[in-house]
């Protein structure tokens, strides 16, 4: 491990030196000296030198408006380069993630030691299902332009790791690194315009093209090797346990920019991109598959005896089919009237069948070494990505469906659906779902909002089957919320049964989730329609914002536990869909820990989880990182299903109920009930300024003028991460633990920490947040930005944080934070030296910006850069 630290530190200092040279060349010695002085003061301040801390503050406060931007950019870019070095070291030959695939082999050994039979292991592998849902959360601050350059920096670091480089080769790589660092410095890191939903979708396709396209088959190849060595099992060509879905272009919850027309466009664009990528694959196969020997069936398919190279012939036919489909889709995207080709690709079988026929023929003719090369990779891509490339989820808020149906019932003279009781709503919906006649009149002209809801359902109905994965209903509260969507889809003429997933996301809704699903499963029509399969989405970010992280995580656990048992009893296969964020206040946690901390049985129906904004780049930004992330997920799911965690003891559950109540009261006491809290929040964080950042296509608020409750979960977390108080990720949790310790429950808490993965993960997550939080910086924001009358509130919160840290260390039996994860502690320490000056500078800039009559472009731009820089330093935004 130490070897890895020193290798990483030397790369970090090399990249830092290259950045320094670039700054000196661009802006002269004076600015570089200024940056270097600040860096040294920051390092010394971190080591506890109080005089240097004061000097750091005065140096940053006294920067002229012309110096602000270069200094902010220097530290921000440095943190981006540090993240690249760290990502590289996590996958370098001796790094931690490089061993994830080997960890699978160790897992199989452990499973065998537990006396699990090879048959049981093979069954678990054959049922494996991982669906990762990419979302365009506005937290990916880094521009795509810069991401490409940073990816190439990673490639250079990997080339430098070869021991046998000649001097001229090393010089060539170093020259390229200099160019990349200079290009990044001379590129504006802040977007000038908000991305449109279509830009976001293109960003998602770029992740597929640049990373997943190579990463998924490479992972399956490694996984297959482990399986053959460990349990004598080979993955069949058609077994691809990994799939990707996207919310980009489908998630319209609170985002008026995502319309039915946008969804239609993104579906076409996605198919166009799939044609593009598969054409490249087939092009390679045309040159590779020059063999002449084949089975009689394949020869007939290729055109009979006169065809010399049957495999090539089939690949060429497929290539022309892909190209004509792509041309048709391009015409549609441009809005032209185009003739549909007779062999238009609409489903995966059209791609799979000819490719698999070639695969079987090569196997039959003794050429399996060729069959299992590039051709197998392409077959696996057909199974993973296929004709749609990524499927999309449509997400809409429950009240939009209620309002649409109410408008219809009023028009038809049936009364006002919105004012009916739940029982009356259900009776009406079930009657209409059973009815053979349409409900929506042809000549009806509804309001624009209702028209939009109906049009979205029509887009789903027209889309080729398999291109839409699910319809998610946010803020779902009642059975009628689910039935309403089924009725709207039926009215749109949807020819297939689309999974409709209620999303339970506030504390009350999580507590009622089991009741709602029990009622639904007792409805005969519903039981018949779902054919034994149900998806339910659990919301992490909104529940944490509503009740605090301790109460929310316990409500999520209990809801999942109850749903698993209810569905098991009803004989329904349940897929739990986890809406986790990247940050801990939004349910984020290292994948392995998060999955093993769920209730027993929660992964039987496979894993479906959102991968958000900035986390997509950290987990799937490079093919090698993709392999490592997928290996982690695979291992965790197999372990959770084959060695499920024990059911928590009764007294542990009772103690969690108490912790949850105490922590929720404390959290809401501040956030909802303290009249000073919202003014303090707005002053002490850059919340108002964040609204100006052109991050995502979605507005930061559900309602333009509401308080904290109307803020989306992401800006809420983002703002507190910036001022280093990290409040949403801990407030209330420590208070609950302190009460329990006072009540003499410390031994019990320690036992829970040792023996219950759910609880130990909660404690580990608190430690991680505490390690990133910083009391003196949070206090500095107060001094620079907050009215003196609100200072006592800030002091109270910081005192609470300090005592929370003590109680968590006591329960975990740790001498200091992150004792069990020295790699992460090292990484945070390394970054703090560069993040601290950005925080101090940000507080200064907020102070200047709020004092100005007229905004100064230099101050505004530098402020945006510090926000991006702190986000890079914290490794997550919202």
Curated annotation (Swiss-Prot):
EC class of the enzyme, as a word: lyase
Q: What is its EC number?
A: 4.1.1.31
Instruction: Give one GO term, molecular function aspect.
Output: phosphoenolpyruvate carboxylase activity
Which reaction(s) does its UniProt entry say it catalyses? oxaloacetate + phosphate = phosphoenolpyruvate + hydrogencarbonate
Q: Which InterPro entries match?
A: PEP_COase, PEP_COase_bac/pln-type, PEP_COase_Lys_AS, PEPCASE_His_AS, Pyrv/PenolPyrv_kinase-like_dom
Catalytic-site annotation from UniProt: 137, 545
Tell me the cofactors it needs: Mg(2+)
Gene Ontology BP term (one): oxaloacetate metabolic process
**Keywords associated with the record:** Carbon dioxide fixation, Lyase, Magnesium
Domain of life, source organism: Bacteria
Record's GO cellular component terms: cytosol
Q: What does this protein do?
A: Forms oxaloacetate, a four-carbon dicarboxylic acid source for the tricarboxylic acid cycle.
The family assignment reads:
Belongs to the PEPCase type 1 family.
Check the record and name the HAMAP family matching this protein.
PEPcase_type1 (MF_00595)
> This chain belongs to which protein, by name?
Phosphoenolpyruvate carboxylase
């Amino acid at each position: 491990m130490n070897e890895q630290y020193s290798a990483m530190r030397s790369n970090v200092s090399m990249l830092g030196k290259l950045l320094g040279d670039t700054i000196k060349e661009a802006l002269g010695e004076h600015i570089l000296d200024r940056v270097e002085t600040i860096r040294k003061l920051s390092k010394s301040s971190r080591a506890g030198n109080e005089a240097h801390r004061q000097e750091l503050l005065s140096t940053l406060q006294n920067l002229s408006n012309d110096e602000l931007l270069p200094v902010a950019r220097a530290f921000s870019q440095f943190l981006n380069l540090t993240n690249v070095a760290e990502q590289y070291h996590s996958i370098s030959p001796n790094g931690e993630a490089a061993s994830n695939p080997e960890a699978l082999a160790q897992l199989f050994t452990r499973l065998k030691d537990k006396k699990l039979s090879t048959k049981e292991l093979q069954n678990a592998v054959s049922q494996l299902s991982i669906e990762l849902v990419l979302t365009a959360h506005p937290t990916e601050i880094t521009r795509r332009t810069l991401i490409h350059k940073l990816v190439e920096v990673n490639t250079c670091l990997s080339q430098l790791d070869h021991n046998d480089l000649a001097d001229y080769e090393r010089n060539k790589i170093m020259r390229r690194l200099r160019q990349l660092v200079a290009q990044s410095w001379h590129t504006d890191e802040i977007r000038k315009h908000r991305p449109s939903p279509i830009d976001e979708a293109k960003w998602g396709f770029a992740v597929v093209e640049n990373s997943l396209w190579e990463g998924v088959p490479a992972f399956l190849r490694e996984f297959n090797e482990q399986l053959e060595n460990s349990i004598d099992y080979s993955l069949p060509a058609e077994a691809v346990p990994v799939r990707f879905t996207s919310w980009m272009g489908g998630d319209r919850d609170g985002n008026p920019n995502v319309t039915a027309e946008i969804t239609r466009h993104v579906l076409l664009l996605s198919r166009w991109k799939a044609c593009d990528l598969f054409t490249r694959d087939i092009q390679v196969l045309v040159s590779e598959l020059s063999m002449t020997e084949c089975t009689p069936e394949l020869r007939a398919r290729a055109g009979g005896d006169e065809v010399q190279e049957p495999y090539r012939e089939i690949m060429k036919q497929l290539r022309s089919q892909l190209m004509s489909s792509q041309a048709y889709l391009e015409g549609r995207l441009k809005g032209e009237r185009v003739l549909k080709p007779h062999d238009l690709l609409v489903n995966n079988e059209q791609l799979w069948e000819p490719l698999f026929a070639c695969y079987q023929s090569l196997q039959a003719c003794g050429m399996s070494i060729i069959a299992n090369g590039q051709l197998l990779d392409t077959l696996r891509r057909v199974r993973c990505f296929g004709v749609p490339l990524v499927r999309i989820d449509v997400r809409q808020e429950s009240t939009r469906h209620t309002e649409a149906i109410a408008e219809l019932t009023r028009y038809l003279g049936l009364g006002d659906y919105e004012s009916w009781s739940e029982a009356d709503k259900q009776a009406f919906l079930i009657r209409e779902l059973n009815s053979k006649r349409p409900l929506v009149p042809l000549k009806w002209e509804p309001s624009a909002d209702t028209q939009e809801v109906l049009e979205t359902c029509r887009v789903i109905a027209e889309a080729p089957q398999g291109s839409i994965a699910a319809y998610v209903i946010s803020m779902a509260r009642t059975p009628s919320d689910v039935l309403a969507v089924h009725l709207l889809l039926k009215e749109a003429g949807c020819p297939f049964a689309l999974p409709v997933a209620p999303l339970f996301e506030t504390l009350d809704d999580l507590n009622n989730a089991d009741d709602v699903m029990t009622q639904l499963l007792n409805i005969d029509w519903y039981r018949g329609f779902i054919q034994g399969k149900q998806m339910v989405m659990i919301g992490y970010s909104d529940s944490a914002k509503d009740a605090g992280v301790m109460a929310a995580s316990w409500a999520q656990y209990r809801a999942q536990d109850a749903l698993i048992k209810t569905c098991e009893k009803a004989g329904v296969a349940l897929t739990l869909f986890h809406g986790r964020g990247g940050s801990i206040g939004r349910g984020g946690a290292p994948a392995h820990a998060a999955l093993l901390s769920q209730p027993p049985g929660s992964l039987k129906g496979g894993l479906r989880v959102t991968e958000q904004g900035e986390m997509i780049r950290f987990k799937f930004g490079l093919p090698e990182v993709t392999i490592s992330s997928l290996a982690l997920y695979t291992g965790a799911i197999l372990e959770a299903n084959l060695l499920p965690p024990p059911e928590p003891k009764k007294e542990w559950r009772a103690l969690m109920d108490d912790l949850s109540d105490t922590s929720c009261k404390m959290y809401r006491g501040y956030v909802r009930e303290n009249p000073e809290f919202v003014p303090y929040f707005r002053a002490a964080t850059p919340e108002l300024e964040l609204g100006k950042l052109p991050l995502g296509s979605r507005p930061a608020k559900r309602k333009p003028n509401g308080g904290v409750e109307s803020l989306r979960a992401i800006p809420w977390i983002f703002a507190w991460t910036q001022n280093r108080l990290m409040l949403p990720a801990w407030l209330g949790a420590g208070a609950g633990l302190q009460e329990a310790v006072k009540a003499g429950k410390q031994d019990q808490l320690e036992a829970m920490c040792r023996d219950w993965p759910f609880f130990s993960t909660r404690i580990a997550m608190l430690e991680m947040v505490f390690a990133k939080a910083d009391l003196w910086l949070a206090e500095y924001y107060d001094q620079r930005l907050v009215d003196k009358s609100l200072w006592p509130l800030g002091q109270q919160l910081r005192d609470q944080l300090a005592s929370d840290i003590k109680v968590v260390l006591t329960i975990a039996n740790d001498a200091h934070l992150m004792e069990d994860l020295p790699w992460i502690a090292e990484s945070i320490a390394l970054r703090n030296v560069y993040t601290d000056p950005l925080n101090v500078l940000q507080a200064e800039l907020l102070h200047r910006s709020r004092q100005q009559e007229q905004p100064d472009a230099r101050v505004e731009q530098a402020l945006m850069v510090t926000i991006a820089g702190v986000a890079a330093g914290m490794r997550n935004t919202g």
